[in-house]
């Protein structure tokens, strides 16, 4: 399954465009908020390390617990035991430099810079990592991790060593202030499947089976396990594409994949027949599952 600790890594090769001018003073980190959020994260990471379901439930947001539950069930894995089987470990905060602690409404974040160790091998080059939190009735809860790969952008690393945080103003790191709607629990799928999306120069929202699974990708590639998988018979698909302003090289493809042994098998693929400037605001189609891994 997708690891419960880490969402899809973010690649920010152009982060240097957002950096402040050399010599500009960094704003001090909110020490009080940092302390509160770090205690939540440490409690969560300890629960993950021990396989402690009670501790995991206490420190994890209700929203994330339901997202993970649906993902595990959609893979036909045992809930909640499968949550503790991920090979990625919660990175320790020791040795990392905290560059930001912020809250807005019911959302909060901690941002760090350094050699982030997920336990896969020796920590490599320095990169940023952002910890996300949601506020509930009894306090802050851990939600998810954003890991940022700077690639070869050494100018960005130099600025981050000085405490730069301008990059946190980009859309993928902003705090919405709102607690997300907790999804409804899904049922075990007839066919386990994943969605693969290529949306370059455009933004697309894909919904399956009336919104049981909903995913938006903007100027990127994406995809994850389909919530509830595919049903036997007709599966509805709604695709809402939009070309981004100023985009010249536009590509859109949506595919549904499953796994046969160690190899991925493409069950279904769609692209708009019209050129990018003539796309409809919405396309409705279907995937018909005749039997497991047999689609027409």
Q: What are these language model-derived features?
A:
Residues 2-3, 8-25, 215-218:
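N-terminal export signals
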Residues 32-35, 42-49, 61-62, 117-126, ...:
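Beta-strand-rich recognition domains
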Residues 37-40, 52, 56, 129:
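Stable alpha-helical elements in mature extracytoplasmic
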Residues 44, 55-56, 110, 133:
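Hydrophobic pocket/interface hotspot
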Residues 50-77:
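Short, well-ordered alpha-helical segments enriched in acidic and aromatic residues
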Residues 77-130:
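Surface-exposed, charged secondary-structure patches
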Residues 203-211, 215:
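Periplasmic plug
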Residues 222-228:
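Exposed aromatic-hydrophobic patches
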């Amino acid at each position: 399954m997708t690891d419960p600790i880490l969402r899809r890594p973010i690649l920010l090769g152009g982060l240097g465009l957002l950096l402040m001018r050399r010599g500009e003073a960094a704003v001090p980190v909110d020490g009080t908020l940092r302390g509160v959020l770090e205690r939540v994260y440490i409690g969560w990471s300890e629960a993950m390390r021990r396989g402690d379901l009670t501790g995991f439930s206490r420190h994890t947001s209700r929203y994330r617990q339901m997202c993970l539950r649906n993902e595990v069930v959609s893979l036909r894995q045992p809930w909640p035991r499968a949550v503790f089987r991920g090979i990625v470990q919660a990175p320790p905060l020791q040795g990392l430099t905290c560059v930001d602690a912020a809250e807005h409404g019911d959302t909060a974040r901690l941002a760090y810079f350094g050699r982030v160790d997920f336990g896969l091998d020796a920590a490599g080059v320095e990169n940023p990592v952002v910890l996300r939190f949601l506020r509930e009735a009894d306090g802050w809860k851990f939600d998810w991790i954003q890991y940022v790969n700077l690639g070869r952008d050494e100018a960005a690393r130099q600025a981050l060593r000085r405490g730069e945080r301008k990059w946190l103003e980009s859309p993928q790191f902003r705090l919405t202030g709102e607690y997300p709607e907790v999804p409804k629990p899904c049922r075990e799928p007839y066919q386990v499947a994943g969605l693969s999306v290529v949306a370059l120069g455009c933004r697309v929202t894909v919904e399956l089976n009336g919104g049981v699974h909903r995913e938006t990708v903007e100027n990127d590639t994406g995809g994850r396990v389909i919530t509830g998988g595919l049903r036997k018979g007709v599966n509805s698909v709604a695709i809402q594409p939009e070309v981004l302003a100023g985009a010249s090289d536009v590509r859109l493809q949506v595919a549904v994949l499953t796994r046969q042994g160690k190899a991925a098998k493409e069950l279904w693929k769609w692209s708009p027949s019209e050129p990018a400037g003539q796309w409809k605001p919405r396309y409705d189609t279907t995937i018909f599952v005749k039997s497991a891994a047999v689609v027409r």
